[in-house]
Amino acid sequence: MTYTMHYDSPLGKILLAADEEGMTGVWFEAQKYFAAKLPPEHEEGTMPVLGDACRWLDVYFSGREPDFTPKLHLIGSDFRQAVWALLLQIPYGQTTTYGALAKQLAEINGGKRVSAQAVGGAVGHNPVSIIVPCHRVVGSDGSLTCLLYTSPSPRDPKTS
C-alpha cells in the first residue's frame, strides 16, 4: 500500500509518497510528471519514512545539508535507476551537467556511449525530487533546466 501526505515548503506544496520499502515520490504540485508513478490505490496517511522525509525537508529548507537520507524505493527502468544513483552522489552545494553524467554512466557501462538527452529524460522522470537531487544538474551552458523550476523563485542549485 502507498501512503501520501502533504508538506508545505517555502517553494509550495509538496506531495510525499511511500510504501513499505521507502519513499516512492516527492513532487511539487506544479511539477511536470506530477505524481506520475502514484498508484491509484493510495491513501492519505503516515508511516515512519514519511516522517523521516519531512524531517529531511525541514533541514534542507532551513539551508543546511541533511546528514541522513530517508529510505528510498525508486521505481523505474535499470537505466533510470543508474542515473538516479548518480544523482545521489552529487555533493550538496555542487552542480554537474547532463553531459558529465552521461560520461560517468558510459564509464560504468564499459564505455558504451550514453547521450546527454537520454540522461536528461531520466533526470526529468526522477520520482523523488529534492531528496534525489535532480536540481543539481544543469545544462552545458550552466542554465537551469530541471523540471522542478516551475516555481517563480527556484532555489539556487549551487547552494543546495
Cite the ranges covered by each PLM segment.
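Intrinsically disordered, low-complexity, charged terminal extensions of DNA damage-control enzymes
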Residues: 1-3, 40-41
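Nucleic acid-binding interface residues in structured DNA/RNA-binding domains
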Residues: 3-10, 55, 64-151, 155-157
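Broad, structure-driven detector of short, well-ordered beta-strand segments within folded domains
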Residues: 13-18
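Compact structured core domains
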Residues: 20-69
